[in-house]
Amino acid sequence: MKFIDLKDKDIAELQKMLKEKKSLLFEKRLQLKTMQLTNPSEIKVIRKDIARINTALSAKKD
């Protein structure tokens, strides 16, 4: 996911995406703790996606 893709979306859609990514992050962390996650770098990617969405949201609010 690139910031350019997020820039064109509206606030409601960004908030929906943020909620989905946060729930996905929770699931991946749970899998990590129970030793079911095969690729721990997925957590890093999801965290960066959340940061991009938050940046796009704050840019829209200004």
From Swiss-Prot:
A Gene Ontology molecular-function term? structural constituent of ribosome
Q: Which GO terms describe its biological process?
A: translation
Which CDD domains does the protein's record reference?
Ribosomal_L29_HIP
Q: Which UniProt keywords apply?
A: Ribonucleoprotein, Ribosomal protein
Gene Ontology CC terms: ribonucleoprotein complex; ribosome
Q: Which family does it belong to?
A: Belongs to the universal ribosomal protein uL29 family.
NCBIfam families the UniProt entry points to: L29 (TIGR00012)
**What HAMAP family would the database entry show?**
Ribosomal_uL29 (MF_00374)
Q: What is this protein called?
A: Large ribosomal subunit protein uL29
